[in-house]
């Protein structure tokens, strides 16, 4: 179900957006073995799922890709978004990609392409998922219980969300993707760029270096601020550092 393949083991917009994942693991003392286990378990769970099979997920990815490439502007919402900041982001051609709980800042879902999440976004993520919104579910070593509980709940909804699966390991896992990045926010940027959206058509709002955003969901403030340093590096290396509040 998974194999080493340096030529196809990631789809990150730049090699470093992928390679930095090893640096993050080393910095926090995390094991790639745990990340692999979580990703493979998620893949196996959904292999023959009636709503989220590999073929259905591929169709979802193609639909989101088409939506993003057709947008005049793709706005990525970070957890520090203030609702009044959205006033200037309501043009007909605007499409949103929300980082986890930041989806709660949106007044509705009509312009939402997807939510990129490792599933700690709490009530706002759950509300969107239970209304059939698309979620790019990320597996890592510390969220097995979260994704298991979330998917168990969502599959019982009258209109379950559509899913795309991502991981952060140095291996190919069939039916999953490594788009690069680390936090939900910078991974959302990596996701959008990896699908071929031109950088000039992408804007970030609600990205902060020194503030744990109100939409962050379940988090430990001290750890989150450390993670934001990595977010800043990834976003800056991709050429979007000027969007980060400092």
Task: Cite the ranges covered by each PLM segment.
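Glycine-rich anion-binding loop/nest that anchors nucleotide
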Residues: 76-81, 100, 181-185, 193, ...
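Glycine-rich loop/turn
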Residues: 82, 92
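A generic "cationic amphipathic patch" detector
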Residues: 128, 148, 205, 215-217, ...
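Acidic/Gly/His-enriched mid-domain segments of enzyme catalytic cores or analogous surface patches
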Residues: 52-55, 66-71, 93-95, 101-197
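A structural signal for short, well-ordered beta-strand segments and their strand-loop junctions
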Residues: 164-165, 201-206, 243-246
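Phenylalanine-focused residue identity feature
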Residues: 18, 28, 96, 124, ...
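N-terminal donor/sugar-recognition subdomains of glycan-related enzymes
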Residues: 1-74, 83-87, 212-246
